[in-house]
């Protein structure tokens, strides 16, 4: 929309030769218009008549006033036209934090003012005549204020000055995902862009710093066509696993309880499992997955990446984890297109001590879970069962498999039960069945690939 209006401005004032149809984009530069203010007003009014807008109507007067002001600012259109060449991540559109918040609030106001509101470009084809005829005066003023934030800015984009890690932006995504959706939005099966903007900006107004600054940065990337933090992670989940799920980044109280590097050797660098979930009660929970375990330092700590793909072969869900024995140290889930849970971290160092205890048949153990958990779970309770050869789980596995029957109780009282096996040779736990609110999910292992150190 910004470029359509910019083009119409240049054309209407005679700084472009008149095209048969309005141009798609503004000129690369905005030559100074050597006209008196009265001549500019005259041309602007004539242009209003040409596009079918009464120059004496309230919207006509708003546009004429804006035309007149812009024509006397030779850099204004050049800044707007620079928006044609957006960077891949949208950083060259990112305003300073206070102006980003002002921009988003204006978008919300425009959305609140009209049913089409922020979707005007789609509804009207983005041409100035349609915008002038369909917008309320308040919405039209808001539209020009939006353009002023871009056209009147000076200096480099804020995107050149602000640098956030993917983990920091993903944490903001997770915080936004935790906000309870209001009833007026929840009842919409496919919320409009305007509805989502209203909800997002109302939520952002309540964010403390630095989350508010990071959240507006993330939203501006999306507005400019860049990738969200969730999309960035799903495009290369292995990179995120390597960056964030590193035991050297654990809190000192937890890290200090772990064995030294090299003291707990495992016979692999990477263990990859191709499997399938089968749920006859809830078929949407069924499908193939890949579960990869990585042994980095032979200290008993194993990191895990489980992924699924969509019909196009793109990763659409990723579960990240770090464990030591039966104790989970870190975990996080990311789902397409823009969902993430907070990075959950073990807070109780005593859980490391429990992970060092031998597993004895008939024993019951209770292990603290990383927090904040997904549904208010605090601990996982496991009953230790019989030991059997690991080859009964999958033919190429070595050593023993200890059967486990574990459960977690959610805050609402519902329970998830997981039957699994502990593979002693590999230092990992493999799930066999899951019983939860969606019924029973059976896990079928299709293939196991071991990459040697």
Question: What do these predicted ranges mean?
Answer:
Residues 8-25:
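Signal peptide processing junction and immediate N-terminal pro/mature segment
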Residues 21-131, 235-310:
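N-terminal Sec/ER secretory leader and immediately downstream segment
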Residues 112-190:
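Extended amphipathic alpha-helical interaction segments
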Residues 118-121, 317-379:
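Extracellular-facing segments of soluble proteins and assemblies that are Gly/Ser/Thr-biased and enriched
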Residues 144-174, 178, 354-411:
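Short helix-loop boundary/capping segments
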Residues 181-244:
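A cross-kingdom marker for long, charged
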Residues 231-331, 366-453:
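Acidic, serine/threonine-rich low-complexity disordered tracts
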